[in-house]
Amino acid sequence: MDIQQQKFWNILLVGDSCEDIYHYGVCDRMSPEAPVPVFRELRQEVRQGMSSNVKLNLKSFGMKVEHVHNSEKIRKHRFIEEKYNQQLFRYDQGEEKKVYPLLPRMSRGYDAVVVSDYNKGFVTPETFEFLKDQLPPGMPVFVDSKKQDLTCFKDCIIKINESEAHKAIIDPTQEVVVTLGASGARWKDSIYKTEKVDVFDVCGAGDVFLASLVYGYLKHGDMSKAINIANKCASLSVTKMGTYVLTTEDINDLCI
């Protein structure tokens, strides 16, 4: 079915937000001051990252999104040698600034809540508890968090990658989807394999997976189908350079 014909869902998205700034250039000489190359910038691209990337991907599926995030975004600068498509280094701005999470009184018009927590201080256990207290019983809450202790996200659908899952403290009763990179994803005792692709850039793939998982779950009400959809979308995103946002054409071509 064409994405334009599908139902629109209302989503509340809460999380840390950033700008991914890509500096493309060339290194064609060495510095006379130190044994390092001189980077000559040719062009620059700015993309929305972290929870802002989740938002854009949710909107690609036709969802209406209310986004609550840090007012002053973190900025991640990546310097890329364009000829070889090689990232030279990255520096970040704004992580050290204290943030004050403020959540408005929530309406009951949401179909799901999504928490994209990069553990930069915006989503605290207290903030999440305040949020949960206002939600009607049974509303699905999806959480992707880089916190080590995830027990505060009780009664939520947690998405986490494999390396983080090994270190995380998770309640055995929690529902957890573990992404396995090229091997797909694990939910309960099942492995959901994904097709092999040429990986170009994994930046933002987890955000695409999360947004697609939410879409698949709301559309089908079935976690297995949702994971298969998320696998397809994440596999597509890693074939693209930089933080990627699914297009309507992508979604229609994937027949999801």
Residue ranges and their predicted role:
Residues 16-17, 118, 208:
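Active-site metal-binding loops of divalent metal-dependent hydrolases
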Residues 21-23, 123, 168:
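Short helix/loop capping segments that flank catalytic or ligand/cofactor-binding pockets
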Residues 68-69, 141-145, 159-160:
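Short internal beta-strands
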Residues 114-121:
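Active-site donor-nucleotide binding/catalytic segment of nucleotide-sugar enzymes
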Residues 2, 8-14, 19-114, 245-256:
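Conserved N-terminal subdomain of the carbohydrate kinase-like
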Residues 95, 109, 126-155, 166-256:
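Conserved phosphate-binding/catalytic region of the ribokinase-like
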Residues 80, 155-163:
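Non-cysteine beta-strand/loop elements that form the S-adenosyl-L-methionine
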